[in-house]
Amino acid sequence: MTNMTQASATEKKGASDLLRFKIFGMPLPLYAFALITLLLSHFYNAIPTDLVGGFALMFVMGAIFGEIGKRLPIFNKYIGGAPVMIFLVAAYFVYAGIFTQKEIDAISNVMDKSNFLNLFIAVLITGAILSVNRKLLLKSLLGYIPTILAGIVGASLFGIVIGLCFGIPVDRIMMLYVLPIMGGGNGAGAVPLSEIYHSVTGRSREEYYSTAIAILTIANIFAIIFAALLDMIGKKYTWLSGEGELVRKASFKTEDDEKAGQITHRETAVGMVLSTTCFLLAYVVAKKILPSIGGVSIHYFAWMVLIVAALNASGLCSPEIKAGAKRLSDFFSKQLLWVLMVGVGVCYTDLQEIIDALTFANVVIAAIIVVGAVVGAAIGGWLIGFYPIESSITAGLCMANRGGSGDLEVLSACNRMNLISYAQISSRLGGGIVLVIASIVFSMMV
């Protein structure tokens, strides 16, 4: 009788624990309601292809696979955890035909038509830059470009050495491997690189692009993996890491900013106003006022970094408004990242491209080039006054990934989303620097 009572108590405790288990903060029965609703929608192929339908699908899917990725041994430490799990599964759902066309359209409308990615990045840039000490921000930005250049030099040297080991000429290594990897992603990197290649050499842009995007895809995977590894190294050797802070404050003496008072929802709303208006101004400058400087196009996110930095330096924003912008940024990065990663997997990840590019030589060369970017940026950053881990992530890995979505994947893998502003400088301004280098390299081949 006693054994039966104990067994009954154990069963009740197990059931109670199961009911209290939470997925994305929701008790299991409540999440089950959301999941069953989504499955009904999938079964009847009835989902609105607007923001409501898209966000419902992205929230529910992101929640379950985020929890799995967060808990899965090895994957959560070495591969990138929840965010990487989410976008890989989402990409597989498209590849395997599990998603219906309506579901793909709903997510695509959120990501492409409504451009949720732009809003996400704009909010993170504003919160990240406004939360930095004004004088420290100026000094760090001035030192960041040389760190990017150090990363490019490191990637080039490592790439040339490994290329020669495979019998590949120096010009081909630079043209087909180093420049696409370090060029700022797809739209701001591989696409304009193929145009420059065609205009300078007269050769096929399509042939160049297909090779460049394959190499870039492999490098992006290594960038994510290395980001997770660098996070682990930073935890073991704490003197190498600023735990999300780029600048070694001992190297840049500054006075502390004034402390913020009470923060209300209104200050948080002002953070949204500043995020959207600064983005709007950056867009106008990039598209109409200064579409190019010296023949090189500057992306609107690069302009936005400079605009928000100028706003911070102007003293127009009170400590409360800065704190409100930071609170909004934290909400987006902590509560909406899993949602965004579903969209990244559906709209920006092609598993077939990854599979096609997986040759032994391509994998080894791409990996070594990314290592070179990390080493170069770490050494350059240390000499400037930055922490090696943070400088290698932002000026190294965020140069070697696939641009805006790659920045989010890399930073989420190493738990450093607050470094998004520096990541965007790498992807945008750094990508522009690579385009200039490409013009010179391609002209030498003619």
Curated annotation (Swiss-Prot):
Subcellular location: Cell inner membrane
Transmembrane segments: 23-43, 46-66, 79-99, 110-130, 148-168, 213-233, 267-287, 289-309, 335-355, 364-384, 425-445
One GO BP annotation of this record: citrate metabolic process
Binding site for Na(+): I181, G183, M399, N401
Membrane topology: Multi-pass membrane protein
InterPro entries reported for this sequence: 2-OHcarbox_trans_Prot/Firm, 2-OHcarboxylate_transport
Pfam families in the record: 2HCT (PF03390)
Catalytic reaction equation(s): citrate(out) + 2 Na(+)(out) = citrate(in) + 2 Na(+)(in)
One Gene Ontology term of the molecular function aspect: metal ion binding
Residues where citrate binds: N186, G187, R402, G404, S405, R428
Subunit organization: Homodimer.
PANTHER family: CITRATE-SODIUM SYMPORTER, NA(+)-MALATE SYMPORTER
Protein name from the UniProt record: Citrate/sodium symporter
Originating species: Salmonella typhimurium (strain LT2 / SGSC1412 / ATCC 700720)
Organism placement in taxonomy: Bacteria, Pseudomonadati, Pseudomonadota, Gammaproteobacteria, Enterobacterales
